[in-house]
Amino acid sequence: MTKLSTTKICVKSPAKINLHLEIIGKREDGYHELAMIMQNIDLFDYIEFENNQIGDIELKSNNKDLSLKDDNLIIKAANYVKDISKKKDLGANIFLKKNIPIGAGLAGGSSNAAATIIGLNKLWDLDLDNETMLSLSSKLGSDVPFFINGGCQFCFGRGEILENYNSKFDYGVILLKNPNISISTADTYKKYSKEYCSNFLTESEKTNDIRNDLRINGFNDLNSSNQIIKVKNDLQIIVEKENDSVKKALYLLSNLQNCLSFSMSGSGPTCFALFKDINKANEVFEQNHKMFNNNGFEAWVCKLINSGITFL
């Protein structure tokens, strides 16, 4: 039996928003070529990992709507880590306290998968390096590699080509989501391809030009004239056109006092507005939370963070 130095650990698994999501082409492997800026926010799931002596992976959660079977990314990630360890007697009892809404465009499942790789690496004393964890994460989904290091990053390719963005953003964020709505990411990308494929680039040189432009200009901060900062999400035009709830959320956010910018995150349906700092976001939230609820939205207030998955 493998002797381990740690018996139980807990990690914070953060959500993300997209400050920039640009679809620039279609890859030979069927995925889309993307240019993105992804940013962690301080809305967290909490995952507890405890060693067991029977070599099984068991998952429980406070969320009754969540599948706890082999299709759950936490289970998949745990099995990948166990396989690479080559130690059949390793096992874990995992408890997920779910706070990030499911199917919301906030990548909660992807974050949980990365947190499982990082958490079990420590729990099982595997000493996997960052490159190995990134390689494992890329097998689980396009957004998962981002969460291995987290913070704010440029994400290229299908999301697996990562470059750190040395941002110092401290914006406050208000999130809105209709709890009765979820959106298929795959279907949204298919619809975008069908409607806008004529805009896709085919030359790698032009793809590199877009990447370099994003690296140089990035997510533009407020300038001296206090103009509204720029966010971009190519999928928004598809989802907003087909989903009245998303359209309403964007309208409500756009009319909030002191809103610097607003957008949809990922493939939706969660939408967000940015504010000068967390204090301003809290102030606006307190003034409007009843209005959000009356319009059928769940709402959260949070802030951008420069860290990713962390241990408690």
Swiss-Prot record:
Q: What class of enzyme is it?
A: transferase
| Catalyzed reactions per annotation | 4-CDP-2-C-methyl-D-erythritol + ATP = 4-CDP-2-C-methyl-D-erythritol 2-phosphate + ADP + H(+)
Question: Which annotated residues bind ATP?
Answer: 101-111
Presence of the UniProt keyword Kinase in the record: yes
Q: In which pathway does it act?
A: Isoprenoid biosynthesis; isopentenyl diphosphate biosynthesis via DXP pathway; isopentenyl diphosphate from 1-deoxy-D-xylulose 5-phosphate: step 3/6
UniProt KW keywords? ATP-binding, Isoprene biosynthesis, Kinase, Nucleotide-binding, Transferase
- The residue stretches assigned to a coiled coil in this entry are none
Task: Give the GO terms filed under biological process for this record.
Answer: isopentenyl diphosphate biosynthetic process, methylerythritol 4-phosphate pathway; terpenoid biosynthetic process
- Molecular function per GO: 4-(cytidine 5'-diphospho)-2-C-methyl-D-erythritol kinase activity; ATP binding
Pfam families assigned: GHMP_kinases_C, GHMP_kinases_N
The protein's Enzyme Commission number: 2.7.1.148
- Catalytic residues, per the record, are 16, 143
Q: Report the function annotation for this chain.
A: Catalyzes the phosphorylation of the position 2 hydroxy group of 4-diphosphocytidyl-2C-methyl-D-erythritol.
So what family is this one in? Belongs to the GHMP kinase family. IspE subfamily.
Name of the featured protein: 4-diphosphocytidyl-2-C-methyl-D-erythritol kinase
Q: Which organism is it from?
A: Prochlorococcus marinus (strain MIT 9515)
User: What is this organism's lineage?
Assistant: Bacteria, Bacillati, Cyanobacteriota, Cyanophyceae, Synechococcales
